[in-house]
A protein has these predicted regions:
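Short coil/turn linking the two alpha-helices of tandem helical-hairpin repeats
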Residues: 31, 36-43, 81-90, 113, ...
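Short coil turns that delineate tetratricopeptide repeat
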Residues: 66, 110-112, 153
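Helix-turn-helix repeat elements of alpha-solenoid scaffolds
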Residues: 44-59, 91-100, 133-139, 179
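TPR alpha-solenoid repeat register
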Residues: 71, 114-117, 158, 192
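Terminal, low-structured helical/coil segments at or just beyond the last alpha-helical repeat
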Residues: 168-169, 176-180, 184-214
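N-terminal leader/linker segments that initiate helical-solenoid repeat arrays
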Residues: 19-57
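Conserved structural position within tetratricopeptide repeats
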Residues: 56-63, 103-107, 143-150, 184
Length: 214
């Protein structure tokens, strides 16, 4: 018994040290908050530069916490957002960078942040031009969207982005169903601004398809 106590103490200390060393999702919370502020409150003409500034901050988190999927996912989200804001060849180059980072996160943990890497990667495949300019691929996009929904079937983002994709593919009835499901998604603690902005996007898209169907 006397030999067992030191062993148990050593195991406890190892577990405690590992828990203290493991990075927390809270590390990326400031990135999440700032991203939502840029997307939903900043003028469109300023967003590319603001996303660029934010990407530098999230890269620092990734560098300081290697193999931490949430940081890689948010790096991919921010860089892909900058790509969309810039457009053109510069945006395409950024989209390729975002794709690489998101793929890295999936190799580490495909379930991190409820499969958010699948959602963001699917959106890139859906919106980036196809060959020879880019890597866009509608079939690949749908495969990834379905994986994102498998990981987070009731989430606001996977349902919104897949619904938007289906509407772009002229599968309006299917797309409407996913948009309506996205509106019913449970609020995300600490993501109030992002949820509010996303719901507005959903409602706008639903109104657009309602008008188009008349």
């Amino acid at each position: 018994m006397s030999n067992l106590k030191p062993l148990l103490l050593s195991i406890f200390l190892l577990i405690s040290a590992a828990a203290m060393a493991a990075p927390s999702d809270d590390l990326v919370r400031p990135i999440q908050d700032r991203w939502a502020e840029i997307k939903y409150r900043s003028p469109a003409r300023q967003q590319a530069e603001l996303y660029n500034e934010l990407s530098e901050k999230v890269r620092q988190i990734s560098a300081a916490n290697p193999n931490f999927p949430p940081a890689l996912i948010w790096e991919g989200i921010v860089v892909s957002s900058e790509a969309g804001a810039r457009g053109g060849l510069g945006g395409l180059s950024l989209a390729k960078d975002a794709k690489k980072v998101l793929e890295e996160s999936l190799k580490l943990d495909e379930k991190a942040l409820n499969g958010s890497a699948y959602t963001s990667l699917a959106a890139l495949y859906a919106k980036v031009p196809g060959w020879p300019l880019g890597f866009g691929d509608k079939k690949k996009a749908e495969e990834l969207f379905l994986k994102s929904l498998n990981a987070n079937p009731d989430g606001i983002d996977p349902n919104f982005f897949y619904g938007e994709f289906l509407i772009d593919q002229e599968r309006v009835a299917e797309g409407r169903g996913y948009l309506e499901k996205a509106l019913k998604a449970a609020p995300r603690p600490g993501r109030e601004l992002a949820d509010q902005g996303r719901r507005q996007e959903i409602q706008t898209l639903l109104k657009q398809i309602a008008v188009a169907s008349k």
